[in-house]
């Protein structure tokens, strides 16, 4: 076999660059929200699974929280159940909640678990109802126009917010060398199911576990300034300034606020990562430049 010296040299450089990061993060917990394009492309799905298995193999503890909005929408359409959204949130009546549980807790969750396990991992699929992993309550949404004397309370059904996270279960799995894969379904005080935004679940899980990092995979290159340039590193103070001056707006606001709250809640750093890039998770963790935006309380890269 002929040795390709250029290829071998590149591999050596990559490993050399990664080694300090591996040492730094060994034994640490990283919570990764998996969604967007990274869940749709077969190549990206395979790369993600391999990334997760490699992280576990070098002593890092990944915890995966996944979305599944498009898959839910597809099944609702096939069942002729109409979808309605208010402020970006799916109105979830009882019939829709049944579909959400079926898709997230069944199809999507088990597909991810199976993919990770096929590449050598030991993943276990969970919903928030397992051992009351995610206790939740109904999310209250209000709207007020200048003509209203009081805000209007809008009922969006079985949409919830996180009350608490059962860290005992997750810590037991992590210490047992398992990789938890969590569907964002919460359980209420009376056993009712709640559909919860996956970013919010990932953020609350990261806070509860005192994770080293929260990583949110997206379909964009990262946070951008008004000139369209990616901002690779920001403090929480700088992010708040960008929100105030309108640089960050619209659909990115909930995701950014989730990342901010995680850092303010004790997570060392949050990352908005371009999930369209192959091996994005490894590149963000193990390279100097990364592939997205890092948010932290201290001066970042």
Swiss-Prot record:
Main localization, broad class: cytoplasm
Class of enzymatic activity (EC top level): transferase
Residues of the site described as Transition state stabilizer: 33, 255
Cellular localisation: Cytoplasm
Residues making up the signal peptide according to the UniProt record: none
CDD domains cross-referenced by the UniProt entry: AAK_NAGK-C
Keywords: Amino-acid biosynthesis, Arginine biosynthesis, ATP-binding, Cytoplasm, Kinase, Nucleotide-binding, Transferase
Keyword Nucleotide-binding: yes
E.C. number(s) listed in UniProt: 2.7.2.8
A GO molecular-function annotation: ATP binding
Annotated Pfam families: AA_kinase
GO biological process: arginine biosynthetic process via ornithine; L-arginine biosynthetic process
Residues noted as binding substrate in the record, renumbered to the chain: 68-69, 90, 195
Family matches, as NCBIfam families: argB (TIGR00761)
Similarity comment: family membership: Belongs to the acetylglutamate kinase family. ArgB subfamily.
HAMAP family membership: ArgB (MF_00082)
Protein name: Acetylglutamate kinase
């Amino acid at each position: 076999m002929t040795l390709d010296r250029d290829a071998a040299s590149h591999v050596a450089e990559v490993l050399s660059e990664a080694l300090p990061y591996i040492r730094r993060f060994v034994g640490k917990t990283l919570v990764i929200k998996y969604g967007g394009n990274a869940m749709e492309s077969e190549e990206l799905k395979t790369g993600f699974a391999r990334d997760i298995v490699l992280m576990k193999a070098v002593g890092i503890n990944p915890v995966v929280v996944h979305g599944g909005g498009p898959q839910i929408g597809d099944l609702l359409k096939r069942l002729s159940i109409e979808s309605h959204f208010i402020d970006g949130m799916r109105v979830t009546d009882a019939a829709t909640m049944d579909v959400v549980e079926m898709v997230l807790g069944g199809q999507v969750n088990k597909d991810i678990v199976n993919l990770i396990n096929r590449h050598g991992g030991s993943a276990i699929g969970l919903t928030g109802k397992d051992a009351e992993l995610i206790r939740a309550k109904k999310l209250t949404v209000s709207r007020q126009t200048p003509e209203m004397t009081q805000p209007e309370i809008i009922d969006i059904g079985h949409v919830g917010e996180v009350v608490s996270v059962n860290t005992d279960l997750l810590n037991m799995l992590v210490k047992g060398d398992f990789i938890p894969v969590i569907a964002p379904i919460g359980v209420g005080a009376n056993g009712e199911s709640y559909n919860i935004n996956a970013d919010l679940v990932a953020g609350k899980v990261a806070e509860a576990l005192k994770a080293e990092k929260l990583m949110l995979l997206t379909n964009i290159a990262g946070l951008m300034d008004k000139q369209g340039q990616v901002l690779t590193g920001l403090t929480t103070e700088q992010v708040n300034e960008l929100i105030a001056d309108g640089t960050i707006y619209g659909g990115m606001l909930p995701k950014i606020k989730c990342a901010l709250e995680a850092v303010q809640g004790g997570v060392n750093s949050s990352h908005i990562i371009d999930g369209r890039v192959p091996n994005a998770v490894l590149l963000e963790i193990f390279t100097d430049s990364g592939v997205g935006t890092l948010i932290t309380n201290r001066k970042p890269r």
